[in-house]
Amino acid sequence: MKKSIVIVAALAAVLAFTGCSKSKVEINSIADLAGKKIGVQAGTTGEAWVQDNVENVQLSSFKTGMDAALDLKNRAIDAVILDELPAKAIVERNPELKIIRDSEFTNNKEAYAIAVKKGNVELLSSINKTIADMKEGGEYEKLVNAFMPVDGKITIPANLAADGSKVVKLGTNAAFPPFEYVEGKNIVGFDITMGQIIAKDAGMKLEVVDMAFDSLIPALQSGTIDFIAAGMSVNEERKKNVDFSETYFESEQVIIVRK
């Protein structure tokens, strides 16, 4: 009997030690990412950054940032690299997680822009005019205040899209709040409202097409969609495949970890 108790006690100690060792993954900066299990959203800047900059990484790519966060909560991975505002939305809903910032990310912000098929000068010019008019006329500031309010209370504007005879298709990945996400049965967000204004200015009816982020550029190239509004960062690799509008927002990458 005593021998059984000793064995059980020893086993409990081993399991307790194992549990403690798992909980002691310390990540406080970029420097701590080497050799860790990192989750990212497939096709994003975060994925490319991890591939290029983190040594001995065990990289897992997910359809959405939330999918990566769920694996983080379940201890299948050690951290998630994601854009700041979507990361904040995830952490607000998951109090056991927190955000780590790093000066490397803060000092190298990325710019979001709308993408069109290479050579689609007419649509690109129309989009650029809308962005310029929004900034000059105050509509852009109103949109920022609606979806990124200081008090955190988002106000979704009424649908602004025109009912034209011609349809323009916006491709997005509706898992990137506050830029694009699902609210009830509708896809809403900063980019979606901006897309509505773009369509209205062009006298066209907007159709929003939701798909995986890494499917957006192939869909644009094939003509399945007409433009991408999905918190897409401008970089040299993407410039080879699409034409970008004037930029409309700056963001940075952050690290999500368990508390």
Regions found by a protein language model. Name each.
Residues 15-19:
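C-terminal motif of bacterial Sec signal peptides marking the signal peptidase cleavage site
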Residues 22-37, 152-187, 221:
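Immediate post-signal peptide segment of exported/extracytoplasmic ligand-binding proteins
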Residues 23-32, 94-107, 200, 205-259:
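Acidic, polar ligand-binding/catalytic clefts
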Residues 23-28, 42-45, 60-74, 85, ...:
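Short helix-initiation/N-cap motifs at beta->coil->alpha
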Residues 36-39, 55, 73-82, 86, ...:
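Alpha-to-beta junction loops
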Residues 48-54, 99-104, 128-165:
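Ligand-binding clefts/hinges and TM-proximal coupling segments of bilobed small-molecule sensing domains
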Residues 58-61, 165-232, 240:
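Extracytoplasmic small-molecule ligand-binding "clamshell" domains
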Residues 84, 88-128, 150, 156-157, ...:
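Periplasmic-binding protein-like
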